[in-house]
Structures are given as C-alpha cells and as structure tokens.
Amino acid sequence: MHDKTQVFPLPEDDVVHSRLTHSLEVASVGRSLGKFVGLKLQERHSNVVPDDVANIVAAAALAHDIGNPPFGHAGEDAIAEFFRSPEGERALESLTESERRDLKAFEGNAQGFRLLTRLQLESDNGLHLTAATLAAFTKYPRTSDKALGDEDHASRKKHGLMQADVDTFRSVAQETGLMERVTRPSATENTSGVARATMAATAATSAAPSACVKTRLRVS
C-alpha cells in the first residue's frame, strides 16, 4: 500500500501522505467509532463486546483500499479500458456476459473483496477473516450488473462484488443477518466508508453477537 497513489499528490513539503498512512489513519478513526458504538450497543445487548465492534471496524477500515490498483481511479479506468479493447475482448471469450462486465467496469472495491477471500497463495480462503469483518468491509454489496447509473446517488453506480464471489457474500450476509436491500435509495447512500463499516458491524454484532464475530468462512 505504501507505494500506491498518494492521497495528496505532489506535496510541497516532506510530509508524504500515502495510501498506507491513509489506511492506518482510517483504521484508527474506525476503531474509535466502533468502540463508541459498541458501548452504546452493550447498553441494549449485554452480550455485545465493545472491543469486538472496534476490532471489526478497524480491520475493515484498514483493508478498505486494498483492492485499488496503482494510480487509483485512473488505474481502474485503464484496466476497464483494456478489457473493452479488441485484445481484451479476446481474453474474455470463455467468460459469461456478467463476468465480462466485472472486468469491463473494473472496480477496486470488488477486487478488494476478492483479495481478502481468495487471493492468498497458501490458502483457499484468503485471509480467513470473520464474516462480520467481511460484512463491514463491503461498502457496495452488489455486482456490476446490479449497479445503477444514478447521478443523485453516486454510490449506486459502484459495485463491490464480482460474479465469482456472490456465493461467498451470501454466506457473509447469512452469518451476519444482513438484509437484502430494497431498490429505493437508503439513508446510508452518502455516508462515509467508516460510517458504513460501523453500521454494518453494528448490524452484524446485534444480529448474532457471538457467532458472526468468530465465524470464518470457507470459500467454495
């Protein structure tokens, strides 16, 4: 992460703010918010452990940019443009139309979920994160064919899952009690990533406090 796009490019001093320092700062803020929410939850649900909520949000926040390619959104556009080219089209011949769309509209958030759950050389289950952590990480719980071009709600244009990872996310949703979203925009559309992660962690720990915090998924 340290050598990826700087959040503030071309600094005029020696204070370099990279994706690594950005992610560490977001994780720190997330941990504090998670602890605050966890304490509030504990007032209503005695079996909620505030530190669990804090750890879930911190882990999700630390990983929130892990799927971003070099050069950030410009890198996403470059990958998508390649797969829309004649040469890229040939590389996609064996895929379904939905799988092709995943790459023609490449999204770092979807790649991040894939990295966390699959792309680990010595494991078929990625980083073995808990269901609650993966639920909190997933900012845009939809595939590319479900993303909508809604100018009033920019986040609805994004997707956070590839077709190959839908079953894994279904397991995450089932373990954590996440509900299928209605089609109309919700109140969380324009909230920050840390706030969304905190809400997801809150929903998860409230639904099944002891189970989802410890449950690790197996990827088929």
Question: Residue ranges of each PLM-predicted region?
Answer:
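N-terminal, intrinsically disordered, basic low-complexity segments enriched in Arg/Pro/Ser/Thr
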Residues: T188-V219
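Asp/Glu-centered strand-loop micro-motifs enriched in Gly/Pro and often flanked by an aromatic residue
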Residues: Q6-H17
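Sequence-structural signature of the catalytic-core scaffold of metal-dependent phosphohydrolases
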Residues: M1-D3, D13, L24-V29, L33-A59, ...
